[in-house]
Amino acid sequence: MKAHKFLSLGYIVLPLLCSPQTWAQFPRQCATVEALRNGVCCPDLSPLSGPGTDRCGSSSGRGRCEAVTADSRPHSLHYPHDGRDDREAWPTRFFNRTCRCNGNFSGHNCGTCRPGWKGAACDQRVLIVRRNLLDLSAEEKNHLVQALHLAKRTMHPQFVIATRRSEEILGPDGNTPQFENISIYNYFVWTHYYSVKKTFLGPGQESFGEVDFSHEGPAFLTWHRYHLLQLERDMQEMLQDPSFSLPYWNFATGKNICDICTDDLMGSRSNFDPTLISLNSVFSQWRVVCESLEDYDTLGTLCNSTEGGPIRRNPAGNVARPMVQRLPEPQDVAQCLEVGLFDTPPFYSNSTNSFRNTVEGYSDPTGKYDPAIRSLHNLAHLFLNGTGGQTHLSPNDPIFVLLHTFTDAVFDEWLRRYNADVSTFPLENAPIGHNRQYNMVPFWPPVTNIEMFVTAPDNLGYTYEVQWPSRNFSISELVTIGVVAALSLVAVIFAGASCMIRARSNMDEAHQPLLTDQYQHYAEEYEKMHNPNQSMV
């Protein structure tokens, strides 16, 4: 975020209503009775000759309307309710045809560029830098806060959210699509909620909660990477500033304070209620969405755009769980980056020696699974002790964005160090939604997990400015180093003593005649060899 590129936020809301957008769950053009009944979401780019004449920008070679490809490989046994959830084989319960864009073109109608590209022909590379929030200037910090606040209040220009399941999507009369408008930031919250919500099994039946399309499996990192990328691109469009980038919060401080919880950043603690945000912060005005879980689970409805109570936050305030009163240590990150396998069977929250499970926080920083442990990402969420510590609500607290950009930075560093080895990302038998080729729920257009399993600077148009901690040695490693050093010292002393003895012997020989009967003739030793060309070593 360069200061000279800042825009006045007060003058850009109206133009947003007609700006192009890429990241809708379902584009507004597809939220119609006809599109839903036909199962086709291939909007026109420039329909100069009438509707349906330029689907997916086909007239200019940007894309084409194709059948959706959905992963059908088996998932793990954690989910036993096949056929009962709209998120299965995403997004085929709603649409079975969508745009497939060519080259670097992207978007619901192939009207924009893939991440990392810009220009009318999407042939110009672009690279933005995600920096440490605390390293930003006062002007840059204020710009970020105001941009987030604007995203919270600005209706998304291109998409709507479903408020009913697929069997009820056309309403009681069969002709009233059940969609609502929602703000840019609240859509960011909604997508997260939709990925973690329970499976509704029917009236009078308890909803199934052991399902999660974005956590506790290999897709944790790829899903949240795209989630952030979506928000960043949405905000770039909103600000009309392609250089805008999301900073990160380096939560690995080992401290029991939240160093970004100040009124010029994410908001300090309220003087009137320690679980609320200070009135001096704009975030005290924010109201959460997707909090009516009981209604969703018993009535089978979905989260809508209705806002509820304020953000709750009480960093290090959970006195009942001392383990979550202090943030991860810098060395935890260093140790995590030494776990060389991306994921390991059963590809779940009990995997051991799994980098994914380690950075997610279900294993200790060395990769060893321990059911009592909460580390790194999980620990940072729980430390916030409020809205940010509840999975379905956590993105309502804007700290979520900064926490996950740092988690993504760790992921990208791991990809760089280990050359993005996809062989440890399971092709099948991961929890539902977590197979390598699964379309991540509920993103649109469909995008697979493996498409995000790439180094960001080379493939996604962003990089991180971060210094990684070096790893301290453990006690056992220090003992090993000490033993090796001692043995090396003994070897040096022995070698020195041998040299002194040899030198004294050579000095005595120097006083003897050059040729005597005891002289070892070279020819005689050579003749003793069976093969003169064979080494004696």
Curated annotation (Swiss-Prot):
Task: Report residues binding Zn(2+) A.
Answer: 192, 215, 224
Q: How is the cofactor bound?
A: Contains bound zinc ions after heterologous expression in insect cells, giving rise to a protein that lacks DHICA oxidase activity.
Where does this protein act, in terms of pathway? Pigment biosynthesis; melanin biosynthesis
Annotated glycan sites: 96, 104, 181, 304, 350, 385, 472
Q: How does it sit in the membrane?
A: Single-pass type I membrane protein
Q: Which residues lie on this side of the membrane: Lumenal, melanosome?
A: 25-480
Disulfide pairs here are 30-41, 42-65, 56-99, 101-110, 113-122, 258-261, 290-303
Entry protein name: 5,6-dihydroxyindole-2-carboxylic acid oxidase
